[in-house]
Amino acid sequence: MNNATFNYTNVNPISHIRGSVIITICVSFTVILTVFGYIAKIFTKNNCTNNDIGLHERIKCSGCEPFCNKRDDISSPRTGVDIPSFILPGLNLSESTPN
């Protein structure tokens, strides 16, 4: 049963590099979006207008934290990463139907 030996020199280096590049791009994209979301949250934290309050009905707690915390909305607990409202325009994540 000596046929079960493995020869690691026959691994295709091109496919290995391609897989590493794809993984690196995906991880970098996730990190960039996360950092971008935190930067957007910092810029919109003290800048809440009536328009920002209205955005909470479409995207809950996207930027203006004080208004989200005052609304006693316990139907959707806050988990995961905040999505800035300008990344996904027009996306309706709330359960209510629009007017």
Curated annotation (Swiss-Prot):
Family, similarity comment: Belongs to the influenza viruses type B glycoprotein NB family.
Keyword Cytoplasm: no
Record's protein name: Glycoprotein NB
Predominant subcellular localization, coarse grouping: virion
Assembly notes: Dimer.
A biological process term (GO) from this entry: proton transmembrane transport
Topology with respect to the bilayer: Single-pass type III membrane protein
UniProt function note: Putative viral proton channel. May play a role in virus entry.
Gene: NB
Positions in the Virion surface compartment: 1-18
InterPro entries (UniProt xref): InfluenzaB_glycoprotein_NB (IPR007288)
Subcellular location: Virion membrane
Topology Intravirion: residue spans: 41-99
Molecular function per GO: channel activity
Record's GO cellular component terms: host cell membrane; membrane; virion membrane
Pfam family, one: NB
UniProt keyword terms in alphabetical order: Glycoprotein, Hydrogen ion transport, Ion channel, Ion transport, Membrane, Signal-anchor, Transmembrane, Transmembrane helix, Transport, Viral ion channel, Virion
Chain segments annotated as transmembrane: 19-40
Glycan-carrying positions: N3, N7
